[in-house]
Regions:
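Active-site beta-strand/loop signature of hydrolases that rely on acidic residues for catalysis
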Residues: 73-80, 95-121, 179, 189-193, ...
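Extracytoplasmic/periplasmic, Sec-exported soluble proteins
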Residues: 87-91, 99, 104, 120, ...
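Extracytoplasmic/secreted proteins, especially bacterial periplasmic and envelope-associated proteins
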Residues: 90, 94-97, 101, 123, ...
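Metal-dependent phosphoester-hydrolase catalytic domains
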Residues: 4-15, 24-64, 164, 215-225, ...
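Residue-level detector of structured alpha->beta connecting loops
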Residues: 103, 133, 156-158, 221, ...
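Structured beta-strand-rich core segments of catalytic domains in phosphoester-bond hydrolases
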Residues: 34-67, 87-88, 111-187, 195, ...
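Acidic/histidine-rich helix-loop elements
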Residues: 48-50, 72-93, 113-117, 196-205
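Active-site-proximal beta-strand/loop segments in catalytic clefts of secreted hydrolases
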Residues: 78-81, 110-112, 139-142, 155-157, ...
Length: 302
């Protein structure tokens, strides 16, 4: 046997693992099917928003449930990097402190753990909800070694109803949490999503997921907001599907980075056609590997 055999074996082992990973990713990207998307039926009394080729709204949906506002609705989306609780037992408390500081009316949370080993078998959603004093709902995306992993919504108002919709994906399951929320006498549909990661490897998968999200939001009875970590920058083909609903673009806010490690903006607040966005920004805080994004909105189609 050659003297360099002990050296070659670990190298071949590493190369085999890398090859298997690449094959898995290729399989995931090119076998995802949009047919797995099952949005609820459209209410026949709701006309669907359409746009011409120039992007102008040519047909307005009938939205109900929103009274005249005395102040802006403050909305936040926040990927909380829930697994960091394993290394920092105060992680959930730091997330809650950030939320309390900015006093949002509605918060969409991603990467929330419920009794997984990564959070020391604690109920992360309940802990954050209790520390913020808000109401809410947790929606599981998948089971993880006896615990759950998913998205959550918090609100200063009330969650009237909520449902989890699976998103088309292969590998780690993804979902969107849909909730009907009532706050300050107003009723709206809020969607919280976390799309497939792994950069350009899964751009096709994210594109299919965003097509599915577009179908879901079009069924909204009330003014809607779509919040989440979309794992793609603004210039990507997949995010372009919602570019005209981007709260930051609607108010001219220059949000460059929401994930400082990647140096990219991948977290968004997308707003229904009738929202006027008074302001939006990313909040540079170190509680998570993502920055929370916050926006102030007025409903303008009363």
């Amino acid at each position: 046997m050659s003297d360099d055999a002990p050296v070659r074996r670990p190298i071949l082992g590493i190369l085999s693992i890398v090859l298997l990973f690449i094959l898995y990713r290729v399989f995931a990207v090119y076998t995802v099917r949009s047919g797995e998307c099952r949005p609820k039926a459209v209410d026949p009394s709701v006309r669907i928003l359409t746009r011409d080729e120039a992007g102008r709204v040519v047909s307005f949906p009938e939205r109900s449930g929103y009274p005249q506002q005395q102040r802006p609705l403050v909305v936040m989306t926040y990927n909380i990097e829930g697994h960091d609780e394993l290394y920092d037992g105060e992680h959930a408390a730091k997330i809650a402190e950030t939320i309390r500081e900015f006093k949002p009316d509605i918060v969409g949370l991603q990467e929330v753990h419920d009794h997984t080993w990564q959070v020391r078998f604690r109920n992360q959603y309940e802990e954050i909800r209790r520390l913020t004093g808000m109401n809410g709902y947790y929606g599981r995306s998948y089971r993880s070694l006896g615990g759950d992993f998913g998205n959550a919504i918090l609100t200063r108002g009330q969650v009237v109803s909520a449902v989890v919709h699976p998103l088309p994906s292969i590998g780690e399951p993804r979902s969107v949490l849909e909730a009907v929320v009532r706050v300050d006498g107003a009723t709206l549909n809020v969607y919280v999503a976390h799309l497939t990661a792994w950069a350009s490897f899964n751009s096709k998968s994210r594109g299919v997921q965003l097509e599915c999200l577009a179908k879901h939001v079009r069924t909204s009875r009330y003014p809607y907001l779509l919040l989440g970590d979309f794992n793609a920058p603004p210039g990507s083909a997949e995010v372009a599907k919602f570019a005209k609903e981007d709260a930051a673009q609607l108010c001219g806010a220059d949000i460059k980075i929401t994930h400082p490690t990647l140096g990219e903006r991948i977290d968004y607040i997308f707003a229904d056609w009738g929202w006027r966005v008074a302001g939006a920004r990313a909040i540079a805080t170190g509680a998570s590997d993502h920055y929370p994004v916050i926006a102030q909105l007025f409903w303008s189609r009363n």
